[in-house]
Every structure is written in C-alpha cells, then in structure tokens.
C-alpha cells in the first residue's frame, strides 16, 4: 500500500488548498476531516472532486490517517484554534510513535502552543505551532 508523505486534518478552505498545493509539489497527502452532523463525506467529495486523479489518500478515521503516513509521521492540523486542537491531539497521540511530528497550522494562542509542546514532547513526539491562517 502506498504511504503518504504527510497527513492533513481539516478540509475547509485553507486545508483543502494547502493539500492541493503540497500535492502539486510532488507530495502524497493523506487527508482527513473531522465529522460533524451534516458534514459527512467531506473527504470523499474532496478526493473525487478537486483532488480527483491526484496523489491523495483518503482517511475516514484518525487511525486510518496515521496508518497512511510514512514514518516518522508528520500530521498537520488545519482546524479551529482552541479546544478543537487539544481534542485532536488527544485523539492522535495513542496512534503515534516517538519521533512523529504534529503541526498546528491554525491561529493558536502562543501560551497554548507552549503547553502543547511540553505535553506532546513528554510522549516522545514533536509539536510545531506554525500559524498559517488568522481564521
């Protein structure tokens, strides 16, 4: 099974366009979107729409996403800052291994980023707070 170079969580406007940009530069990208009522099928719509025929690996669960990425894994989140980031980290950690990297591409408060660095590094992983969007 082909493995992705990076995993991306969040297929709203910023995440979708970032995934397309990475893929256009030669990266294979595993994509996942948190599911809320009425938003089921976001991943499939993306890979069968704007991502059709491109190097995307659809993931429908955190486990699928993590398993789809080459080691050491790099998982980037493009989701709303605050509690959603903490919740996603909690879901990711049990499936990741020492040396893996979690990147927060949202607009998180730097105090939250500093706290997350300590929490994630205590598990042997790396955490990068790299705000891309002010949204």
Each model region followed by its residue ranges:
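Rossmann-like NAD(P)-binding element
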Residues: 34-37, 49-115, 119-121
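Short hydrophobic/aromatic-rich motifs at helix boundaries and adjacent loops
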Residues: 15-16, 87-90, 129-131
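Glycine-centered flexibility motif
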Residues: 5, 105, 129, 134-135
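NAD(P)+-binding Rossmann beta1-loop-alpha1 motif at the extreme N-terminus of oxidoreductases
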Residues: 1-67, 95, 99, 128
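Rossmann-fold dehydrogenase core element
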Residues: 116-134
């Amino acid at each position: 099974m082909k493995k992705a170079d990076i995993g991306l969580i969040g297929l709203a406007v910023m995440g979708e366009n970032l995934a397309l940009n990475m893929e256009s530069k030669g990266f294979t990208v595993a994509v996942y979107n948190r599911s809320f009522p009425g938003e089921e099928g976001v991943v499939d719509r993306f890979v069968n729409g704007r991502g059709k025929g491109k190097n995307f690996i659809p993931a429908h669960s955190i486990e699928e996403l993590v398993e789809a990425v080459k080691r050491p894994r790099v998982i980037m989140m493009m989701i709303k800052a605050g509690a959603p980031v903490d919740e996603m980290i909690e879901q990711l950690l049990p499936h990741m291994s020492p040396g893996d990297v979690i990147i927060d591409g949202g607009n998180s408060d730097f105090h939250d980023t500093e706290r997350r660095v300590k929490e994630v590094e205590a598990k042997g992983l790396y955490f990068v707070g790299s705000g891309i969007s002010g949204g």
